[in-house]
Amino acid sequence: YYYPGGPIFFYLGNEADVTLYVNATGLMWENAPAFGALVVFAEHRYYGKSRVLNNTALQYLSVEQALMDYVTLIDFLQKSYEFDKQKDAVIGFGGSYGGMLASWARMQYPH
């Protein structure tokens, strides 16, 4: 649905495989065409397909690390699609823990 100048609708994955939410998040899909939005579903580290390989890797299972993962992906998308960070919005979506992540991301990374 994306067209230049449209926002990124960014789903912050939570405590399950992100594919469970792709078809259950109608709000994003219903509004994306009207806004020309790029729709992205990002999976949370160590959930879904990305599993913990060993106990030492668990140190990276934190809210702070999850937020940094999402910010890194958003930065990559903004560069890849030549977004104007001053004008083009990133709108976070999520439910349950993912909803809290969306709120925390907005507070910690308002840009």
Predicted regions and their residues:
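Gly/Pro-rich cap/lid or specificity-loop segments adjacent to the active site
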Residues: 2-111
